[in-house]
């Protein structure tokens, strides 16, 4: 996993920590190494080891040391430029230097299983023999880029990217996804075993607090969230008189000062805010895969008002605690109904709790993972 899992509360890192928690529990049967590259600051290693004492942390920077400038130029920078010129790939993000240093780790340890996060780093195992390799896909990258760069991608480029993504996938023994839609796509085209991993949410011990927060929105600052919250504030929020919106996460940096919008930034205890929230919003005009923040809110029994893309990846599209809105009027109407109609609110809240209990418990996720690693 490239990023320090404690560097933010983004959904991909939340899920990474859930997997690390599982691996930490099976250390009696396995010696486990976690290789990561970026966003590690002083003191972060100690925090990681206190959380996951049974996992060996290996920090491997993307770039090699620059202490010897001549060596760095010839062994890192120049080789990267040559690869970009003669072996360009729309998917591959691995430099020759990083490939070489990662393969040394593989050679030194002789792993039974190797799990790579993100298809962009799939080439790290292209020369590996003898290990069972797993791609933890996280996202359908071609679709992610299409929605992010839709004005700049031709159908020809998208076709080439899709081909490159599938080619990278075929070098693995199996592929993990947590989206029901992406499972179907990968199974049809990748010709590899695709395993649906349920994203688990620990059942929170909910402190009974006064519901002082009308609306809560928790998000990172990825481009999909930035454009979606802009739409919400411009098109939906003006339709909600006397309603307060509390915003949490890096997305706050992209939100202007607006009446009745309270920006909290990054917070230490997210549960304390969920416990006080009546309704969660997830405006989502584009994007791929399951939305971890939707699952987080549902796990607290909080109904979620969202767009069609907000329920992508969910195993059940109906009676799950989410209200899907096709336009700004419907989005505002759903919020008002939840805030004003107690019986309707209770129904949607109970649906959220039931959906999470049936599909996203830690027990269900561990059962699937145990089947992978024969940990029974």
Label each residue range with its predicted role.
Residues 134, 155-158, 166-205:
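Donor nucleotide-sugar binding/catalytic pocket of nucleotide-sugar-dependent glycosyltransferases
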């Amino acid at each position: 996993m490239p990023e320090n899992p404690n560097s933010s509360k983004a959904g991909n890192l939340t899920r990474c920590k859930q997997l690390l928690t599982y691996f930490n529990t099976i250390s009696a049967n396995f010696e486990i190494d976690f290789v990561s590259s970026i966003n590690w600051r002083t003191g972060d290693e100690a925090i990681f080891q206190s959380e996951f004492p049974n996992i060996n942390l290996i920090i491997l920077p993307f770039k090699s040391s620059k202490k010897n400038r001549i060596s760095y130029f010839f062994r890192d920078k120049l080789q990267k430029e040559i690869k970009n010129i003669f072996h360009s790939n729309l998917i591959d993000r691995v430099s020759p230097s990083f490939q070489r240093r990662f393969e040394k780790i593989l050679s030194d340890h002789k792993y039974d299983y190797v799990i790579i996060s993100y298809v962009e780093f799939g080439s790290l195992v292209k020369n590996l023999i003898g290990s069972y390799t797993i791609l933890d896909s996280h996202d359908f990258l071609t679709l992610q880029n299409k929605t992010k760069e839709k004005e700049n991608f031709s159908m020809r480029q998208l076709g080439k990217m899709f081909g490159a993504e599938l080619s990278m996938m075929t070098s693995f023994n199996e592929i993990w996804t947590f989206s029901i839609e992406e499972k179907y796509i990968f199974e049809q085209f990748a010709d590899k075993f695709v395993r649906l991993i349920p994203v688990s949410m620990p059942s929170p011990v909910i402190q009974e607090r006064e519901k002082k927060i009308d609306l809560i929105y928790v998000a990172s600052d990825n481009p999909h969230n930035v454009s979606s919250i802009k739409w919400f504030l411009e098109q939906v929020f003006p339709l909600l008189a006397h309603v307060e919106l509390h915003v949490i996460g890096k997305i706050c940096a992209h939100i202007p000062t607006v009446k009745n919008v309270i920006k909290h930034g990054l917070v230490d205890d997210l549960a304390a805010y969920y416990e006080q929230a009546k309704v969660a919003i997830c405006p989502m005009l584009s994007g791929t895969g399951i939305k971890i923040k939707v699952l987080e809110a549902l796990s607290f029994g909080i109904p979620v008002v969202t767009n069609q893309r907000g329920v992508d990846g969910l195993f059940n599209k109906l009676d799950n605690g989410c209200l899907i809105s096709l336009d700004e009027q419907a989005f505002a109407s759903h919020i008002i109904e939840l805030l004003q109609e107690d019986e309707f609110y209770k129904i949607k809240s109970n649906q959220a709790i039931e959906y999470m209990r049936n599909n996203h418990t830690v027990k269900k996720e561990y059962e699937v993972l145990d089947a992978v690693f024969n940990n029974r």
